[in-house]
Amino acid sequence: MLKYCKKCVLPNTRPNIIFDKNQVCDGCSTSNQKSIEIDWQEREKNFSKLVDSIKNRSSFYDCLIPVSGGKDSTWQVLTALSYGLNPLCLTWKTPARNSLGEKNLQNLINLGVNHIDFSINPKVEKKFTLKTFEKFGIPLIPMHMAMHALTIQCAINFKIPLIIWGENSAFEYGGNDNTLKGFSLTHEWLKKYGVTNGTVSSDWIDNDLTEHDLRPYYWPSDKMQEDAGVQAIFLGHFFKWDPLQTFKIASENGFLKGEKPKTGHYNFADIDDEFLITIHHW
């Protein structure tokens, strides 16, 4: 039965969402926590301590930031730079990137960072996207797998100790992320909340897609990540996540909004992609 949150009207078709006895979603409950219960000054102090510990390591890059050029990743980069971190930025290049997305990504790079723009073999990407759409009605599974897998692969290969993600969607918008407390992104988190329908790259190996084809979508083992000393955090754990505020800060630093919304009501979200992101995953 279709239900809607009585506060925000988010439907129960969103994966992992939970409603309380008053039919209020856990995303709204989280909003109350952010406003009343969480000590954000203490969280920011914890981030400063983390930054200090990272700077004491001998890596050339202090952190890796997955970016699209959108308002949120622009804010992530600005925050990292304001703390004196030396980031490497990595982008999974959507096959549908538009001119506005290109401009905003270049604007992010011009903030003063090194950047890798990673394109996956288009023949593989096309096959994989079609398969996920036919099986689940979701063409975005390859996108989410690629964004997360390429990031951890790159951090391990470049010996970068810290990955800085944006918001924890399972905390901000609904999901029972009780064990991780919104702090870190792990393989366990990705499989449950990463919009992959609980699948991993090896689940999609068949006569059309080989293990070699799907290598960019492969998440290294927990042991490989642990041995490399790579930690992946959500910046939204340390700073109060507010899309309107990140939009304001990004706009003050060159980010351009769209002429009209691509999806929903906002012209500053999901505007870098011409068609793929507009096919919503729930």
Report each predicted region and the residues it spans.
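Long, structured ligand/cofactor-binding scaffold of large enzymes
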Residues: 75-77
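Nucleotide-activated chemistry modules centered on ATP-dependent adenylation/adenylyltransferase
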Residues: 1-63, 79-282
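Short, glycine-rich nucleotide/cofactor-binding loops
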Residues: 63-72
